[in-house]
Amino acid sequence: NKPEALVDYTGVXNS
C-alpha cells in the first residue's frame, strides 16, 4: 500500500 498511488488517483479525480 503506497500513499503516492493514493495521491495519484486523487489528482485524477480532482481533474
Swiss-Prot record:
Which coarse location class describes where this protein primarily resides?
secreted
Keyword annotations:
Antibiotic, Antimicrobial, Bacteriocin, Secreted
- What domain of life? Bacteria
The question of whether Heme is a record keyword is answered with no
Where found in the cell?
Secreted
Q: Where are the transmembrane segments?
A: none
One GO biological process from the UniProt record? killing of cells of another organism
Q: Which GO terms describe its cellular component?
A: extracellular region
Q: Which residues form the signal peptide?
A: none
Q: What does this protein do?
A: Has bactericidal activity against Gram-positive bacteria M.luteus, methicillin-resistant S.aureus, methicillin-sensitive S.aureus and B.stearothermophilus as well as against the Gram-negative bacteria E.coli and S.typhi.
List other remarks: On the 2D-gel the determined pI of this protein is: 7.0, its MW is: 10.7 kDa.
Q: What is this protein called?
A: Bacteriocin BAC-IB17
Q: Which organism is it from?
A: Bacillus subtilis
Query: What taxonomic classification does the UniProt entry list for its organism?
Result: Bacteria, Bacillati, Bacillota, Bacilli, Bacillales
